[in-house]
Regions:
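Exported/periplasmic ABC-transporter solute-binding proteins
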Residues: 2-29, 33-42, 46-50, 59-62, ...
Length: 248
């Protein structure tokens, strides 16, 4: 049987689970080949708009695939969820209840991804806004956090991640950030890869739920549609949840 290749563009935070999902799908679907392209969702959206041949788009937000509807893409379906955690050296002893004070400390180097290019950065900045609106926040907290945030990943000019390594863990281990606000799933991987790091839960009152959106290009192959359906199936969802993602 001739092989049917399907280009799938996906958020970088999905690298581990979608690689596993793709292998399982290929094993079950004779002749199917899934070509995974990972990156910051906003940058992937721009590449798709510029004409790159994606047939499936798995984004870390709903807005980017929805924005492609006028360009011949189908409806966006929520397929999984994530949340924010803080990644930091364990020696700092951070806890959820001390996290806000720590990141507001002028001495703390605060890392985020790049807003607009990477939804992780957008969610981090929304977290800063929620901190600013909280009853006990110091005056100007939101502006201070936005000004001090080092946008170290996810931008068009960000350094390429080291091959086979979690970029967030590397950045914190190297001291480029004392605290990095990222997805909880990223923080779990970083802690497993780098000794001496810990993941700190962001308090629920200021946390941001990341709804991930899935869309298929109109006119895409039947295999592309089948792969999208497989991601949404119990088998695909089980893989995502095993990697720390939540049900949509």
């Amino acid at each position: 049987m001739a092989q049917t290749s399907v280009p799938v563009y996906a958020a970088g935070s999905l690298r581990a689970p979608l690689t596993e999902v793709a292998k399982a799908f290929e094993a079950a679907q004779a002749g199917a080949k899934i070509e995974l392209v990972f990156g910051a969702s906003g940058l992937l959206r721009d590449r798709i708009r510029a004409g790159e041949p994606a047939q499936v788009f798995a984004s870390a937000n709903m807005e980017h695939p929805q924005s492609l509807a006028a360009s011949g893409w189908g409806a966006t379906r929520a397929f999984t969820r994530n949340a924010l955690c803080a990644l930091a050296p364990a020696k700092l002893g951070l806890k959820p209840e001390t996290l806000v004070a720590a990141i507001l400390d002028p001495k703390t180097k605060l890392g985020t991804s790049t807003p607009k290019a990477d939804p992780s950065g957008d969610y981090a900045f929304e977290m800063f806004a929620r901190i600013g609106r909280s009853a006990n926040a110091p005056q100007g907290a939101q502006a201070a956090l936005e000004a001090k945030a080092l946008q170290l990943t996810g931008g068009p000019n960000s350094p390429a991640p080291p091959p086979g390594k979690n970029v967030y863990g590397v950045l914190v281990a190297q001291g480029q950030a004392d605290v990095f606000i990222t997805y909880c799933t990223n923080a779990v991987v970083a802690v497993a890869e780098q000794q001496g790091l810990q993941s700190i839960d962001v308090p629920a009152s200021i946390n941001v739920t990341a709804d991930y959106g899935l869309a298929v290009k109109q006119g895409a192959s039947a295999v592309a549609q089948a792969f999208a359906d497989y991601i949404l199936s119990p088998a695909g969802q089980a893989v995502l949840q095993r990697h720390g993602f939540k049900q949509p």
